[in-house]
Amino acid sequence: MSVITDIHAREVLDSRGNPTVEAEVYTELGGFGRAIVPSGASTGEHEAVELRDGDKSRFLGQGVLTAVENVNGEIAKAVIGLDVTDQRLIDQTMIDLDGTPNKGRLGANAMLAVSLASARAAADELGLPLYEYLGGPNAHVLPTPMMNVINGGKHADNNVDIQEFMIMPVGAKSLHEAVRMGAETFHTLKSLLQERGESTAVGDEGGFAPNLKNNEEPFEILVEAIQRAGYKPGQDISIAFDCAASEFYNKDTKKYVTVADGREYTAEEWTSLMEDIVDKYPVISIEDPLDENDWEGWKVFTERLGDKVQIVGDDLFVTNTNYLEKGIKMGVANSILIKLNQIGTLTETFEAIEMAKEAGYTAVVSHRSGETEDTTIADLVVATNAGQIKTGSMSRTDRIAKYNQLMRIEEALGSTAQYKGIHSFYNLHKQF
């Protein structure tokens, strides 16, 4: 047993220039771990609390000095002396210390930084790569990536309501090949947009952010880009998209108000529109198609489309086993998006992934729109054999860093590495 001897946190910046928490953990045998916490733009209302200072004289109120002080003070005092390899004890100690159901006192950003840095310190001390330390000898599945190539909604300053349009190289034979296919399609898409006189400026996650005539046009453009890049839509590369529907849902009128279409939709009408898109285009995954509190609407949506496509709950589940358990019992969605900072500790993240798998739901490990150079999620997705990752486009170093780490991991695993492609959708029997 080697104990934690020191913890230090500081305020650094994320990819949007907003402050975030970085923590370092040191052990008595020389282990060292560093982790930086990401942050989201479209956040679920049930997420764990990201503690911000609110001091308008610093970073427009977005500073995190209080969270940093919580790490360097209360958390350090409680965690120093604990066995660095006892992740569950470290995380539970912080949960108990916080004492709130949503980590609102110490901040999920403070707790997650320590949780992740502790795991890295333990891996460093044992001389193991992080994915092997977290997942053991069975960690071998490389994820099928969701590559966000067209941005809309809160991730871009354009008129597209749907937040993310993604390509998934389901026909690739390896992660390396998947990255190449994605990059080729991304660059082909750029040329296509330029030909059409559209903007090729990129959004928060590295995808292009053009103004388009409606919410269906991006699907048409993606199909053409995939074909021009030399691939078959639906066979080599499929399409995934994230509505982030809570962001354009009017709670008073109970309608989905779209800018691109200039229309308002009831849940029934919006579901029918999504069904038409699935029938018309090579779509394999839809995230947050309805408002996060419309559980009955989600149930109907799942009944109508659940055997055709992966239906991912992000704002709906917020990486929380309580909400996931409710969804499983109701038959809502068939997949969960996993975001470390939605729940705040590594232990609780593992619990959510495990619960999803046991229920036959897939788990998609995800970045946030405000990212950093930290690559923990690349190791996490391999450690858990989750099979899918959502980590942005083929641009911006904060996104590419994760792909580069995954390629390193695939190389290190050698012949034991497995890229499942279409078979990572084990919740969709009709795909095989």
Swiss-Prot record:
- What are its cofactors? Mg(2+)
Give the reactions, separated by semicolons, that this protein catalyses: (2R)-2-phosphoglycerate = phosphoenolpyruvate + H2O
Residue sites binding (2R)-2-phosphoglycerate per the record? Q163, K339, R368, S369, K390
Asked whether the keyword Calcium is assigned, the reply is no
Q: Which SMART domains match?
A: Enolase_C, Enolase_N
SUPFAM superfamilies xrefs: Enolase C-terminal domain-like, Enolase N-terminal domain-like
Q: How is the cofactor bound?
A: Binds a second Mg(2+) ion via substrate during catalysis.
Catalytic residues identified in the record: E205 (proton donor), K339 (proton acceptor)
- PROSITE patterns in the cross-refs: ENOLASE
Q: Which UniProt keywords apply?
A: Cytoplasm, Glycolysis, Lyase, Magnesium, Metal-binding, Secreted
Superkingdom of origin: Bacteria
Q: What class of enzyme is it?
A: lyase
Q: Where in the cell is it found?
A: Cytoplasm; Secreted; Cell surface
Task: List the InterPro entries.
Answer: Enolase, Enolase-like_C_sf, Enolase-like_N, Enolase_C, Enolase_CS, Enolase_N
What's one GO-annotated cellular component?
extracellular region
Q: Does the keyword Secreted apply?
A: yes
Any idea of its EC number? 4.2.1.11
Q: Which GO terms describe its biological process?
A: glycolytic process
- What is a single molecular function from GO for this protein? magnesium ion binding
Question: Which protein family is named in the record?
Answer: Belongs to the enolase family.
PANTHER family documented for this protein: ENOLASE (PTHR11902:SF1)
Role according to the record: Catalyzes the reversible conversion of 2-phosphoglycerate (2-PG) into phosphoenolpyruvate (PEP). It is essential for the degradation of carbohydrates via glycolysis.
HAMAP family (alphabetical):
Enolase
Q: What is this protein called?
A: Enolase 1
